[in-house]
């Protein structure tokens, strides 16, 4: 009899738990789910920041990545390599999220096959390059400055021409991309456009 009463009491508690226990349980479950979600979200974010992810589609691997492999950003005497995300993904969280949202448009064009052949890519190269240059100009070449900084430069260790250009650029308030277009990827064809209007008068790519 006592056992039956005990079972009924337990059943009632399960059917109508105390508000105190309900709130505590919900908070615990919410916390655990939040930790799992945040962990999964950050894992996914980091996975999309790997160079292997960037070149997982052939448009990147077969075109711009092959160009990049021939540049000083890929192989140099110091062994320091700037990978795709180093140059194209901000490190600060807010700006990184904004860039990830923008990337959804690139996924759409991947599906549409906008640049899925060399011919299509070359036809769009100038537009794509200008989009990147405009963005870098707007952010004062923020990603370049993760590795390069005027204040940290030892002008005495640079060649005379580099000292002159960097000094003039610093005095004129120029940013990296003003002079260094085409340093990591081939420049677009400028046959039908004014080169100075696209590259700027001071471009030293």
Q: Residue ranges of each PLM-predicted region?
A:
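Short sequence/structural segments immediately N-terminal
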Residues: 2-205
């Amino acid at each position: 009899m006592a056992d039956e009463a005990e079972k009924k009491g337990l059943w009632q508690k399960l059917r109508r738990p105390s508000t105190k226990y309900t709130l505590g349980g919900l908070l615990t479950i919410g916390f655990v789910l939040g930790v799992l979600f945040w962990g999964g979200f950050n894992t996914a974010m980091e996975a999309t920041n790997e160079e292997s992810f960037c070149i997982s589609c052939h448009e990147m691997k077969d075109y711009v990545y092959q160009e990049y492999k021939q540049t000083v950003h890929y192989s140099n005497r110091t062994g320091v390599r700037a990978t795709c995300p180093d140059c194209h993904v901000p490190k600060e969280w807010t700006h990184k999220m904004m860039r990830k949202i923008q990337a959804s448009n690139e996924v759409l064009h991947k599906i549409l096959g906008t640049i899925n052949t060399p011919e299509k890519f070359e036809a769009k190269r100038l537009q794509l390059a200008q989009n990147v240059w405009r963005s870098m100009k707007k952010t004062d070449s923020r990603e370049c400055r993760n590795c390069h900084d005027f204040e940290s430069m030892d002008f005495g260790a640079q060649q005379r021409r580099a000292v002159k250009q960097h000094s003039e650029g610093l005095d004129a308030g120029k940013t990296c991309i003003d002079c260094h277009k085409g340093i990591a990827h081939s420049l677009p064809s400028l046959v039908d456009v004014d080169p100075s209007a696209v590259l700027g008068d001071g471009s030293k790519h």
